[in-house]
Structure formats: structure tokens, C-alpha cells
Amino acid sequence: MGQGGSRTGEVAEYIRDGLDYTQWLRNFKEGLSVSTNPRQMRLDYTITMPGLLELKNMFNLSQELDTEVLTKVMFTFSNDEIMSPLSLPKDLLHTIIDEALVYMEPRATKKQRALMDVIKNLKTRETFTPTSKGKKRQLYLDKIRKQDITKILSKDKRVLDWWTSI
């Protein structure tokens, strides 16, 4: 795995506190080596706001492992749900998706179809204005978990600037 894989690991470990991405990837590859049906081993990707920055890396991982990537979007019940990709301003969300699609569309196989369909559909969904309450809640959770979301978001200055402005 190149740098993209380690970056995916960083975000995965942030989202799934306690996950050891290197061990998970080793286990996944071992599972692939003994699976007898492609439906036995598939990547499961829930797009969160920080996970949105991993679209290309998840696409690459799916291709590298030659496995399907099942894709869904984080549920959003209120505008306090700052971890939802729908908390981003619509223009920024669409730009990030469009940049990913330019990269992915010429390379995609049927194994990335769900990923492509979900992110295209994401552009049709309503976004919302996140609250400072939602940001404070996330910062509180970061403190408990001894994490820092800004380290993840700093991978894309546009997203970090948005986060800082809340």
C-alpha cells in the first residue's frame, strides 16, 4: 500500500476509535485469500465528513484488492451532526465529489459502481448549516478519545477553513 492507504488508515482509525488499520487490512487480505465467493469479502464504506476526503483512496483500495465497495452515507438527524458530509456547504461538497469523479469515472469497474452511484446521489441531497453546538460536541468527543479532527481535516485546506469558520 502506498501513501493513500496509510492516509485511509488514519481517517479510519479516527472514525473507528481503537481500530488498528494495518491489522484490519492484513486480516481483510487474509479473508480474501480464502473466500470462495466475491460476496463474502467486500469493503463497507460509510461516508462521513472526514471520510469524504478518502473517496479516491477507498476507490483505489477497492481496485487494489479487486473487491466491491458497499457505500452509504452517515445518517443525519439534525444540524448538530457535524460529522455528516451534508454539513459541508453545497459548493464545497459538490467540488470534492466532482474532483473525485474526474479521477474515478475513467477507471471504475462494476466493483466501484455503488461508490459512484452514492456520491453522485449525494449531490442531489439537501445540505444543512452545521451548528457551533455540533462542533463543540465533536471537540468534546475528540478530547475524550485523545484525537484531533483538525489533523484529518488539514489534508484539505478548504475543509479545514470551513471547520475553523464554524
Question: Can you say where each PLM-predicted feature lies in the sequence?
Answer:
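Short flexible/disordered coil segments
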Residues: 7-9, 65-73, 100-117
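Weak global preference for isoleucine
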Residues: 15, 47, 73, 82, ...
